[in-house]
Amino acid sequence: MKKRIGHDRLFKELLETFFGEFIELFFPQLYDAIDLEHTKFLQQEMFTDVTRGDKHRIDILVETSLKGESGIVLVHVENQASAQKDFAERMFIYFSRLYQKHRCRVVPIAIFTYPEKRNEPDRFKLLFPFMPVLDFHFLTLELNKHNWQDYIQSNNPVAAALLSKMGYQKKERVQVKLEFLRMLVRMELDPARMTLLTGFFETYLILNEEEERKLEEEIGKVDEKEAKRMIEITTSWEEKGRVKGRMEGRMEGRVEGKAEGQASLLLRQLKKKFGYL
């Protein structure tokens, strides 16, 4: 349960910081339709399933409107970190509860982030032999079906973070990390956003020592100025991770501490090679 809470927190922080970039990257038609100049993140809502005795909390709920129209539109984003047989039904229940409470249009979005490739449904139907009763649709994003190489030229920060959750082979892990660092260098974000993206990426793609050595070799092949910026980014993340790990000592701290240790290995090797920092 704690692990689920940690994953939910990471995605919530990423999407609340880069909501417009997320919608633009994966749902361009929705991006063109909604007014992102006027968005408000609503408090997470808790729904109780009395029949099953379960409680579920809405992951992300955004209040906005359509361009050129009056009235409120809600965008509901649900992150699903593990396969669930009745997930489509749960999306419908969330939708119906939100509509019942707010009485406005709701755009439901499901993000599937687990590594297994599955054909996830994007609808929930209730039918009789003699008539259809319900055909509920929702938008879906199955990250593991997206090729990471299709996004490495993007300047979208969400694309950089989510490289770690996209479809790649084990032998590509080093290259994925290298391209992630290149994207950060190119985007030149402020330190807070840089730390957020690095923390997210390092949580889901942690290189082993052999892979770190290979990454060192690859960084040694790039332009020296670019390599220096990569080292600076890694150094900043290492320092913040060490402080946070000492302060928290929780699950998140342990994950970041592990990533931080690997960053230290890479830094020691690169400092010897380039002789700075």
Which functions belong to the PLM regions below?
Residues 1-277:
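Elongated, amphipathic alpha-helical interaction scaffolds
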